[in-house]
A protein has these predicted regions:
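Hydrophobic beta-strand segments of well-ordered beta-sheets in folded domains
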Residues: 2-4, 35-37, 116
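Ser/Thr-glycine-rich phosphate-binding loops at phosphate-binding pockets of nucleotides
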Residues: 11-12, 39-41, 134
Length: 140
């Protein structure tokens, strides 16, 4: 049987958004015909929110948190127990303090199985601010 591996954000769904309803129905049929795997940086809850529980459970295996939290349907088959050191968290907080970027939306250090997600901007409200943060600033 053919096997297919898909990224979620920006491939099956718009980044951090839910899958289109029409596409979702077609993709579920696809998952019934082929061994389908998902790979994402998001945790299980966010992935289910994006693709829906039917698709999530129909996939042969889902590699959440970049492979640090792996599921076969409802069954967890692997979860990394790595935790960041206090020194690393302190360093990231220092980087946040030293940044000149003026906008902060909260949730700057997000703990996930096997890793952390760090953002100067933060993971709080306001996706539009991402464009401001990633746009190159004019040089003097």
């Amino acid at each position: 049987m053919k096997k297919f591996i898909f990224d979620v954000d920006g491939t099956l769904t718009p980044s951090r958004k839910q899958m289109d309803v029409g596409f979702s129905a077609e993709f579920l049929i696809f998952c019934c015909k082929y061994d389908t795997y998902l790979v994402t940086g998001s945790d299980r809850a966010k992935t289910v929110e994006q693709v829906g529980l039917d698709i999530y459970n129909r996939c042969k295996r889902v590699f959440n948190c970049s492979g640090s939290d792996i599921y076969d349907g409802h069954n967890s088959v692997y979860r990394s127990n790595w935790k960041p050191s206090d020194e690393l968290i302190s360093f990231l907080n220092d980087e946040l303090d030293y940044s000149n970027f003026p906008i902060r939306t909260g949730n700057h250090i997000e703990h996930r199985p096997g890793g952390i997600n760090f953002s100067i901007l933060g993971r709080g409200e306001g996706n539009m601010n991402c464009l401001l943060y990633t746009s190159p600033s004019p040089r003097d």
